[in-house]
Amino acid sequence: MPTPEKLATDATVAIMLADGFEEVEALAVADVLYRAGVRSDLISVTDARHVTSSHGIRVVADLMLEDVDLSTYTVLFLPGGMPGTLGLKGTPAIQAEVLRRGW
């Protein structure tokens, strides 16, 4: 996502994408965050920046999971959708970060 010209907060949001994600849950949230002046990144947990939604829509993520440190984000957002949620659940880096945060 492009960074808003004027940030309203120092908070950052990692929007995690796995193949089969629900595009409305992921992209509507990204849009609202952008309009609110909150920096968010679409992060692919697959082996490519292109991620396919549960309805076959291809989205290009901003970053690959292997290139980020999830602990630097204020919030992790895990959108629903099948089988996307299973892809997120099965990602060791997400599991570790959720446990580190005590969720």
Regions found by a protein language model. Name each.
Residues 1-103:
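Extended, subdomain-level signal for the structured scaffold at the beginning of enzyme domains
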